[in-house]
């Protein structure tokens, strides 16, 4: 099942921005609000798994409840209907920027003052979420973005959980949730966590952006988790000279093993960071320098100059004897010899007795590369990672192994882990100006297979030609993605607006507001006042292409409407006609007998009543005899 390119007839998916363990994030266009958004879609292969489905829904609920400038906003959620069932998605604010992980990988450590500013803003975001009863549980550099205007944005509440839910069975299991290098000790032990766990993880992030590497590094996630629980971190200043002792103190307090010894809230950590930023001493305990440690451990001065140093006698308990000391030493030697003999015998059996013990290669398909490596190394195999494109398996997850799962190998032999880099990528060619058929062929030649045409208004010259593509030309995209080919449909149709009764200039403005800019003024014979618009061609209300030339019909003011003169005497009819502006001549028709009208009254007239007549036109009247 593949991800549809259109969701709910509103969101058009574009290029993939990134992948997570259970989702993929697309740049998308909100067709209703005409803005770019980021759309996170649950991986199609996980949509049918109730646990992943509920976890994804929980992320949407958690993030939607958090409205803060330093937290990526959630605009909408929904489910797309697919042949295999509903596919949930989350519509989020699109942040045009880079993650802290990318910054450190590309540019190395961040200057301490800037690092303090970034983490202080992240503290605000986390403190806001904690106040609303939600802990993040996966704070790491990849989940903190810096936008192009330097705004800090915390994102991905994918494994966040409401504090009110922390007593349920999911949280209490021994399953470790989060990323190994940023786990709090209580997370690593599978214990219930609270907001102080996020403080620890944020301390790990601060450590990494100051020094260029996380506080603990190991060959496997298990090894790193062990260090979080058991080992103290090296002060950041020993790895990067620009870190001050005051900043050391803040980092190490955030990284305290016991949650009670850490900052109790993200707000407390932010307050100490601001103090350090302003050149003040933090509330965190001071971290001693090497010189200060040496000074404290130096021997006190002798009571008097030149006094000889003597070994102090060691008191021994009653009954202690030299014979007992000797027997203990012999016992320790015997244990050591036995351990060495065990190793020698084991090696001899393997060398003389035949092949080493065979071990079955476990199935690690669709696990993360780190988890797969740990599983294989725990079986005694050496591992090497080979990254390759795959159209089915999401990036960062294992395609398979070589030898394949189920094979039996000798312990210590090498297994190649094939890790997906995602679908094969290709550069979208520029097909603007081509016909749709030509564009499809050019896109096929570039490696793409799925296409969809979308009409869009254009100039007459662009009608039937490609205007653009989505993804855009010269961008890389997965070859399995559908390419939208935007084809010119010619000028957009619009109704002609009415401007009757206006003057010509006002009419032009009204038509331009409706999208019609090509107009011509035509004077016509009409009874209306001179200069008054009496209509348009095409007539108002008609829908026509916006590039249509609209005739604005303006009255010459040279006509009047012929009145009904039948039954009137000429002495009455003449004043009526002149009052209407008539300046023409009377054409007297033949008299009419037996008309029923009074003698000399008008019996017939031409033009007939109600007809527009030029003011200088000839009028024919017949009178009763």
UniProtKB/Swiss-Prot annotation:
Keywords for the protein's UniProt record, in alphabetical order: ATP-binding, Cell membrane, Kinase, Magnesium, Membrane, Metal-binding, Nucleotide-binding, Phosphoprotein, Repeat, Serine/threonine-protein kinase, Transferase, Transmembrane, Transmembrane helix
Positions annotated to bind ATP: 17-25, 40, 93-95, 140-143, 156
Disruption phenotype: When depleted (with anti-sense RNA) no vancomycin-induced degradation of RseA is seen.
Gene Ontology biological-process entries: regulation of primary metabolic process
Ranges facing Cytoplasmic side: 1-331
Membrane topology term: Single-pass membrane protein
SMART domains per UniProt: PASTA (SM00740), S_TKc (SM00220)
Segments forming domain Protein kinase: 11-274
Composition bias type Polar residues, residue spans: 597-611
GO molecular-function term, one example from the UniProt record: protein serine/threonine kinase activity
Residue list for modification Phosphoserine: 169, 295
PTM (free text): Autophosphorylated. Dephosphorylated by PstP.
Regulation of catalytic or functional activity: By K-252a.
Domain notes for this protein: The PASTA domains interact with peptidoglycans and are required for PknB localization.
Protein name: Serine/threonine-protein kinase PknB
Protein's organism: Mycolicibacterium smegmatis (strain ATCC 700084 / mc(2)155)
Lineage of the species this protein comes from: Bacteria, Bacillati, Actinomycetota, Actinomycetes, Mycobacteriales
